[in-house]
Every structure is written in C-alpha cells, then in structure tokens.
Amino acid sequence: MAVSAALVLLGLLSLSGLDAIQRIPEVQVYSRHPPEDGKPNYLNCYVYGFHPPQIEIDLLKNGEKIKSEQSDLSFSKDWSFYLLSHAEFTPNSKDQYSCRVNHVTLTQPKIVKWDRDL
C-alpha cells in the first residue's frame, strides 16, 4: 500500500513539474494563397513551441482585432504546444495585418506583422 501511494505521489509531482517549464511562443504570419489586392484570401497565424498552454492570439487589421477562428490546442513530442488562428481577409496595399500573442512568458504582447512579400 505504501509503495502504491509513493508511486502516485511521485507521478503527481512529476506532472506538476511540467508547469514549471516555460517556453516563449514562436509566431509565423502568412496568407494561404499568394496575395492579390482585392482577391479574398485567408490570413494565418501559426504559434508554436510554447508552454504552459494558456495563450491569447488575436489577428489584427490596422491594429484592430478582427474575427478569427482557432484550431484545437495540440502538443509536440517535447510537450510544447501549438495553435493556428486564421481569418478570411481581402488584402490591399493600404491595410496592415498582424498577429498579437499574449503569453505568461512575455512581458508584453508579441506583435508580428504580415509581410505580403514572403
């Protein structure tokens, strides 16, 4: 009985230690198709390599939040997490699009601009 209790306690302690590992999110912003002004497309924000899993991701048009959808939270072999946030958009040369990520590892939100030339 004591051995079982010790094993359970050891397992719980090792799981709680996962929260102590913090990893800063990496961010990539790209369009699904090559951009053409006035042609509908999808803007993607891929956020990966972060831990713990609690994170806020917003897609922005000229600094204002736009309606977006998000994939289910997934994790890699190293227990870091990744998500894809995406939104329909129609690019033009006047508007600026970006992705804003807020995570416990960041002192301020990380904002990555979409570069239409990539």
Curated annotation (Swiss-Prot):
InterPro entries: B2Microglobulin, Ig-like_dom, Ig-like_dom_sf, Ig-like_fold, Ig/MHC_CS, Ig_C1-set, MHC/Immunoglobulin
Key words of the record: Disulfide bond, Immunity, Immunoglobulin domain, MHC I, Secreted, Signal
Signal peptide limits: 1-20
One Pfam family here: C1-set
PROSITE patterns in UniProt: IG_LIKE, IG_MHC
Keyword Coiled coil: no
Compartmental location: Secreted
Purpose of the protein: Component of the class I major histocompatibility complex (MHC). Involved in the presentation of peptide antigens to the immune system.
Subunit structure, as described in the record: Heterodimer of an alpha chain and a beta chain. Beta-2-microglobulin is the beta-chain of major histocompatibility complex class I molecules.
UniProt similarity note: Belongs to the beta-2-microglobulin family.
Protein name: Beta-2-microglobulin
Protein source organism: Ovis aries
